[in-house]
Amino acid sequence: MGPPWSQESSPEERLPTEWSRQLTRARWVLLAVLLCGLLLGSSMLWFYIFRNCGPCPCETPVCMELLDHYLASGNRSVAPCTDFFSFACEKANGTSDSFQALTEENKSRLWRLLEAPGSWHLGSGEEKAFQFYNSCMDTDAIEASGSGPLIQIIEELGGWNITGNWTSLDFNQNLRLLMSQYGHFPFFRAYLRPHPAPPHTPIIQIDQPEFDILLQQEQEQKVYAQILREYVTYLNRLGTLLGSNPQEAQQHASWSIVFTSRLFQFLRPQQQQQAQDKLFHVVTIDELQEMAPAIDWLSCLQAIFTPMSLNSSQTLVVHDLDYLRNMSQLVEEGLLNHRESIQSYMILGLVDTLSPALDTKFQEARRELIQELRKLKERPPLPAYPRWMKCVEQTGAFFEPTLAALFVREAFGPSIQSAAMELFAEIKDAVIIRLKKLSWISEETQKEALNKLAQLQVEMGAPKRAVKPDIATQEYNDIQLGPSFLQSFLSCVRSLRARNVQSFLQPFPYHRWQKSPWEVNAYYSISDHMVVFPAGLLQPPFFHPGYPRAVNFGAAGSIMAHELLHIFYQLLLPGGCPACDTHVLQEALLCLERHYAAFPLPSISSFNGSHTLLENAADIGGVAIAFQAYSKRIVEHTGELTLPNLDLSPYQLFFRSYAQVMCRGLSSQDPQDPHSPPSLRVHGPLSNTPDFAKHFHCPRGTLLNPSARCKLW
C-alpha cells in the first residue's frame, strides 16, 4: 500500500480544482485588459497634453514686439530649405540689418538719457558728461565761433601762410604738440597695447598713419587719380574756409597731396608684411633713432605717453620698419628743400582731424569727401546722421565710464545679467562636452583645452570699474570745459589719452574693453584670456529673459559659443596642434573651405574663403554647440514657449533666431571683414547642421540639406 498522497482522486473530487484554475485564468485576462486600457488611456492623455499643453505661445509685450520684428524682417513666401537667409532677412524694402538697427536703438537710449533733466553733483563725471553733450548740441555757439578757435591753435604751431604770418618753428617741437596736445599723428601712430607675444605686457607700439586715400582692392588702383583729385578738392576747400584765396589754397593743397602720395607709396599691406615676417620688430628707442633719425623719438614718445618714464633703452614694437625708414628720409629731404610743403601737410591734416569739433562748413566738406571716395570705390553712400547721434558718439568716447553706468542701469539690470550668465554657463558646458568628443584632438591637447576653458574670464554688461561713479569722477578731474566747443573737445582728447596711459601703468593693469558697453559686438581678448559680452549686445531682439528659450539660445547663445571657440583658434592654424591628428584636422578644414565655396554669391561680393576660414569654423561650431545646449535644456525643463503666428516649432524658432542675428545687407560689409558675407553666415552653418534639415523637413539635395557635411567641432 503506497503512501497516502499517492492515492487517486475521483472525478467528483477534482471538479473544484479545475474551476479554481479557470477562475484564476479569467482574473489574469481581466487584469491584462485593464492594464492595456490604462496604458492606452495614459498614452492618449500624454498625447493630449503634448498637443494641447506643449509649447505655449508667448504673448507678453516683449514677445509681441519680437514677433512684429520677425514678421517685418523676413519673407515667408521663400522656401526655407532653398534660401533661409531670404526667409529670415529679406524684407520688402531690402535686406534688414539687425546689428545696425540694434546699434541705433542703443544710441537712441543714450540720447534719451542725456536729454533727460537731472541734477548732478558739482564736478562729477555725470555733470561733465552732460555739459559736454549740451555744448556739442549748441550749434548756434559753434557756428558763432567759426574758425577762430582753430586759427588760434594754428598760431600756437607757428602759424601758416594761409592764416597769417608763418614762423618756422622746430619740426620736432611742432610734431610733439600735434600728437600730444591735438591728437593728430601725421607721420606715424604710437599707442600702448599688450605685447603680441606672451606674457602680453603693455608696450609702446609704432604703426603706419591712417590715410583717407588708402587703397584696398585692385579696382581702386584704376581710380587712384580720381581719388587724389577729390582729396585735393577737399584740402583746397579747407584752405578757403581758413581765409585763403582759391589760388593759394590750391597750391597748398597740391603740396600736401604730393607729400601724402609719397608717404602712401611706402606702405605695404599687412598680409604682405606678415608673410615676410615683418609685422613685429622689437627695437629700442636708440635703435629706432638710428634707423629713422628725422624724428626725435625719445622726446616725441615722452610727450605722447606722459607720465611714463622713458629712456633711450626703452623697447618698442614696430609694425613697419621699412615705412619708418623711408618716411624719415622723405621728411629730411622736405625739411631741406620743401619745408612749407611739410607745414601744409601737417596743418591741413590737423584741420581734418579736428573737423568733428568745428562748424558745419568744415564737417560738410569732410562728409562730401567721404561720399565721393565711397562712390569711386563703388560703395553705397553713408546715411545722413542727425546731430544728436554725433554728439552721443563723442560724449561716449570721452565719458565712457559715466555713460556705461547710465546705460547698464537702464538696460542691463540684475535679472537680465543673471539670465545671461545662466545662458553662458549652459553654452560653456556644451563646449566642454564637444571638446571631449572631438576625433582629431589628442588626449593631452584635450586636457590643455579644458584647462584653458576653466581659466577663462568672462565679463558681461560693462567693466566693473565703469559702474563706480567715484572712479569716473576722479578720471575726469583734468577735463576743463569751454569756452569754445573745440577747446572742450581737445581737453577731452588729452584726458582720454592720459587715462589710457595711467591704466597701463597700474601694478596689475585691468582689462580695458575694446568695445563700449553699448556696442553690439562681443569679442575674445587673447592677452587677458577673457570673453566680453557688452550690455548693448544682450538686448532685444538678440536676448531677453522673457523670450522663448529657443530665441535666446539661437541668437545670443550662438554668439557666445562662437566667441568661446575663438579660444582654440590656434589649434586650427598650420602647426598649431602638433599632437593632434593633423590628417583628420586638415581634411575637415579643406572640407569647410569647399563647403563655403559651393554657395552662390552676388556679383558684388569679393569673398575669399581662405581669408574667412577661422570665422567660418566658429560660425559652424557656434550654431552646433548652441543647438546642443538648447536640446539638453528642452529635455530637462518643461514649459517651452514659442512665438504665435509664425508656425514655427521651438527647434525651428532656434534656427530662425540665429539667422536673424546675421541679417545684414551685403553692401554694408567692410572689404577687410574677416567674416563671410551675411548669406553665407546663415547658409554655411545651417546646411552643415543635420538638425536644421530634420526640423524643416528639407528634401535631400536641397541647398540646406546637402549630401555631404563637414565634421570639425
UniProtKB/Swiss-Prot annotation:
PROSITE patterns: NEPRILYSIN, ZINC_PROTEASE. InterPro entries: MetalloPept_cat_dom_sf, Peptidase_M13, Peptidase_M13_C, Peptidase_M13_dom_2, Peptidase_M13_N. One of its GO terms (biological process) is myelination. Residues 57-713 form the Peptidase M13 domain. Disulfide bonds join 58-63, 81-698, 89-663, 136-391, 591-710. N-glycosylated. Its EC number is 3.4.24.-. Residues 1-28 are cytoplasmic. One of its GO terms (cellular component) is membrane. Its cofactor is Zn(2+). Heterodimer with XK; disulfide-linked. This is Kell blood group glycoprotein homolog. It comes from Mus musculus (Mouse). The lineage of its organism: Eukaryota, Metazoa, Chordata, Craniata, Vertebrata.
